[in-house]
Structure formats: C-alpha cells, structure tokens
Amino acid sequence: MRTTFTFRSCVVLLVLLANAAPVAAQQADAKLEAVFKSYLDDYFRLRPLEATRLGDHRFDSQLEELTPEARVKWLEHTRKTLTALPKEVSYQGLSRPAQIDFEIFEHTLKADQWLAENTRPYQEDTRIYNGYINDGVYLLLTQSSLPRETNVANCIARMAQIPKVVAAARQNLRSPPRTHTETAIRQNRGAIAFYEQGIFEFAGKTRQLAALKAAAEPVAACLKEYQAFLEKELLPHANGEWRLGEEKFAKKLDLELNAGMTADQVVADAEAEFARVERDMYVIARQLWSRYFARQPLPPDDTDGQRWTVQQVLGAVAKEHCRPEELTREMKQRVAQLKKFIAANDILRLPEPDHCQVVEMPEFKRGNSTAYMEAPPPLDPNATGQLAVSPPPRDWDAQRVNSYLEEYNNHMLDILTIHEGYPGHSVQLEYMNRNPSLIRRVLQSGVYIEGWAVYTEQMMLDQGYGQGDLALRLSQLKFYLRAVANTILDHKMHCSNLTDDEALEFLMRRCFQSEGEARLKIIRAKQSSCQLSTYFAGRMAHYRLRQQIQRELGEKFELRRFHEAVLAPGAVPVKYLLELVRAKLEKPQ
C-alpha cells in the first residue's frame, strides 16, 4: 500500500508541476507586456508625435518639447527602463516567444541609448524639425480612425504649437550639413503650400473650416519667416560633417542589423553579390540586344563591352515610360494586376480588408525617394495606409524630368509596386499589425521589412509575373543591383573620403542609374547612415532562409505556407527567423 501511495503521489506531483510551468510562464509573459505598456505610456507622454505615428491618439493635441532639457529627459527614461527591465521581468521564467520579445525590447533600448549618446540629430539634421511641422498635422488627417471632427480639433491644437518647434529649431541647429539643410529648405516650401492650401483638401468638408483657416494662417506666416532663416542665416553656415566615420558606422550598423554580422562582412557580401548580378544582367541584355538593335552587331564581350551592352539595352527599355501626371494612375493599375496574380498563383493570402490607398506624395515629403509605404499604425490598424508615389519635383527642368521618368519606366514601375505594395511592404505590414505581440507590433526590424520587400521582387518574376518578359527581368536585376550598391555606397561614403563625383561615377557607370536618380541616392546616403544597408542584408537573410527551409522540406515545401510562416512572427530581427518559421511550419494548417 505504501509503495502504491508513493507512486501515485509522484504522478500527481509531476502533473501539477507540468501544469504549473505554463501558468508561471503566462504570468511572466503578462508581466513583460505590462512593463512594456508602462514604458510606452511614459514614452508617449514625452513623445506625442511618436504616439501618433504608432496609432495611440491620447496625445494627438500635443507636440514634443524639443529643448535640450526635454531631450535629456528622453535619454533618462531610456536608461531607467533599461536598468529596471531585468529586475522587473525574469527572462528565464518567460515562454520562448516572450523571451524573444524581451530581447527585442532590451536591444531597442540599448540602440536608442547609444544613438542619443553618440549622435546629435537635433543640432545637426535640419530635416528633423520638418517632421514635427508637417507630420504632426498631416498624419491626423490621413492615418487616424478617430472622427474627423476630433482629428481637425487636434490639428488646430497642434498648429498652435508649431511656432515653438520653429523656435527650437532656430535655437538648436548649429552648423548642420549643407545637404540636410537644402532638403529641409525644399520640404519647408512644401509645408508652406500645405498650410496655405493642401490642409483644407485633406480635411475635407468640415464645420470647423473657419477655425482651421484661422489656425493655418499664422503657421504659414511663421514658416515663411523660418524659410528666410533657413536660406539666409543657416544655409551660408551649413558646413557640418555628414560622414559618420568608420567606428561609429560599424557600431550603428551592428545595432541596426542585430544579426551578428560586422560592417566589413556585410560590405564584402555585397561586393561579391554585385559581381554576380552584373554577370546575370549581361546574360539577359545579350538576349535582348536584337529586339532593340536589329542588324547591329553585339559589342565585344570584354568587361567594357559587357557594361556597354547592358547600358544600351537598359537605355532602350527606359524609353517605354508614362508622362509625369500619369505616375499615380499607373501605379494604381499595377496594384490591381499584382493582387490578381498573387491570388491566382497562391503566393500568399492577401490580408482583408485592404487598408492601402495609392496617393501622390505630398510635396513636403519629397526629396529622398520615389515612393514609400505608410502602413496603418500598429496601434490603430483600422486606419488608412498610403502607398505614395512622387512625380518629378516642380523645380526640375525638362531634361531632368525625362531622366527621372526613364529611370522609373513602365518595367521599373512594376518592380517598384511589387516592393512597396504587393506582396512587399503593404502586405507585410498588414500581417504585422495582426500579430498578437504588442512588442513586435511596435518595435519593428527595418532589416526584416526591407529584406522582405527586396526578396519579393525576384520571387514574383520567378513565379511567372510578367510572363517571362526579359525586359522586366533585366529591370528587376537593375533594381536589385541598386539594393546591393546601396550597401557599398553606404559603407564607402561614411567610412572613407569618397567624393560625390566618385559616387556618381559608381552609380551611373557600374549601376546603370540615371544622373537624376544617382544624385538623389547620394543625397540619401549622406542623410541616412546605415539605413541603405538594410535592403541587401535583409534580402540575403530572407533568401538564405528560403533556401534552407526548401531544402529541408523537399517536395513538401509549399510556397504559400512558407511565405505566411515568414510573415506570421512579425518584423522580428532576422536572426530569429529560422527558429520561428520552423516552429510555424511544424504546426498543422
């Protein structure tokens, strides 16, 4: 009897312990989420515009204090949270998914602290104030699911605070780089136009129109004075250093990637991939030569001849483009085509409802890119997303406009729409907004996000989009070569003394970019250290993941299941993808 009783007691004890473990993990997981929510509450009080960008509308009537004293409080909040996190949450007690969330949260805090201690954007980046001046109001009218009357009232409240933002800019800015200041000047012209006219178009029919006009008029006047300050006082002394330097670049890239790769390893990978893509482009261009240059002999196939062949064929392909005013319409048509193809070919299940709208990029957001995707904010997922495309800037001459349109010709628009829209950013960000983890919805990996978008460009053509059109494939390779070159350019511009002329030569001769596109890319490289490297690093992570999973599963590999397994965890650092995708695929459908 005693033996039987002891055995049964052990069995009961083991069952109780087995049940207790998940309960304890659930409690620890809930504690982590509570700590993160508390962090966000304090963060949003300090950073109202960041709250709006993420979709928390409790502080939509406020804007940040941008004084040096206020920014010290931001850093103190980060340091305090980083110190308290391991004391308040037991990492060992968390479930594995929550452990990943813990690591993401902790890494983000460390990265934020390093950036605050080692960079000086509020003293050196003139553009940063444009975000408060423009996005503080624009986002309320375009990406909030609150009633229109509430959004307009919050706009009016924020507009009253814009003079304080301008005053802070005038106080804080000291010898910023010239390229940052020139972009800010162009964007501020757009901001003036927005407050003089555009804001009323975005606000639509509202009983608050008179109050909105009364609030916008002094803002436009304030910004005109700010424009004079930028042009006449700041620009003549805008001789600050934009290069990050090798040591800071390496550290910042390590924090940005969070993938266990050094800056030197990333650029070495990029240089090897660059050579491979060059060879592939020549193979395609050779097959297209007779289509565009009938009866003309193929150039010699030495290095110079190969590059000349590719350049000539790309030049011929580029002639097939729309007019400037047709860019937005053309992208809308491509969105419809892509969605139909994705559904018909079982690429993945498209999220419903679709919150994405194709719009013309506002003038005050132009200057760095041709298109961007602004998804519904993660904390307001039912708001509208915007796929914005930029027509050529109004101050460009006819030659530069034509160069821009040739760069974004009909074939390149296909690739751009895949990348920014379907199944690229728009689809991925909609999936992310459905993730149950608050930490993953808010703290997103740019490497994952850009890598997914670049991965989809080749994948869609591999699955038959474009019906094997070689001109489209050559355009896709050119677009991908740009992503690879971004990494090389990013590294060389910030870690060496590469001149603008040398960068222009590299982009135009080796990367086959038009002069207009190349000059924009040089400006962007100066203004966004390390971000340009995320495209290639992320793409290689997604590509290698696909290779490994497909080899492991063999004939059981299903493309749709794989894609949805990649999207399911949210935009996590890519080092977690293999573990998470395997776990997802092991579960029944």
Model-derived segments and spans:
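N-terminal secretory signal peptides that target proteins for export/translocation
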Residues: 1-7
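Bacterial N-terminal signal peptides
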Residues: 8-20
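N-terminal maturation segment of proteins
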Residues: 25-589
